[in-house]
């Protein structure tokens, strides 16, 4: 059973429960972690970001993606408000689709050291070509159920 949640005043380092400025860059963004109260159990956590945006590093035009982040936590969980702020920091960041997707996966893995993590970046077409990017760490723990990401590949009209 989980312990009584801490009040925000007891967790001054966390962004949760208090007003914080929006980070302007991914490097400036703080990704918080919290202890996993079920660390002795293998299970899956999924974050879905269907409106992720970044900028093309060449044209400065916006790029849009549907991100799916799945992970089997170890001792730590990603705190969701900090993840939201981290992902939002890409709105003014210029990088190619592959770089954004893999960098996000690596940053989360570095911060929380999950037993397993995968990220799927389903990017909307630019120049007529959709790009889907996938990255994962190691092997999935035995017995953990991972549903399909459920994001259809891009299909044009017709």
UniProtKB/Swiss-Prot annotation:
Keywords: Cytoplasm, NADP, Oxidoreductase, Queuosine biosynthesis
GO BP field: queuosine biosynthetic process; tRNA modification
Major subcellular site: cytoplasm
InterPro entries: GTP-CH-I_C/QueF (IPR043133), NADPH_dep_7-cyano-7-deazaG_red (IPR050084), QueF (IPR029500), QueF_type1 (IPR016856)
Pathway: tRNA modification; tRNA-queuosine biosynthesis
Record's keyword annotation contains Ligase: no
Residues that coordinate or bind substrate: 78-80, 97-98
Catalytic activity: 7-aminomethyl-7-carbaguanine + 2 NADP(+) = 7-cyano-7-deazaguanine + 2 NADPH + 3 H(+)
GO annotations of cellular component type: cytoplasm
Cellular localization per UniProt: Cytoplasm
GO molecular function, one term: preQ1 synthase activity
Record-listed E.C. numbers: 1.7.1.13
Keyword Cytoplasm: yes
Superkingdom: Bacteria
Record region (Disordered): 1-35
Enzyme active site: 56 (thioimide intermediate), 63 (proton donor)
Matching NCBIfam families: QueF-II
Similarity remark: Belongs to the GTP cyclohydrolase I family. QueF type 1 subfamily.
PANTHER family, alphabetized: NADPH-DEPENDENT 7-CYANO-7-DEAZAGUANINE REDUCTASE (PTHR34354:SF1)
Function: Catalyzes the NADPH-dependent reduction of 7-cyano-7-deazaguanine (preQ0) to 7-aminomethyl-7-deazaguanine (preQ1).
Descriptive protein name: NADPH-dependent 7-cyano-7-deazaguanine reductase
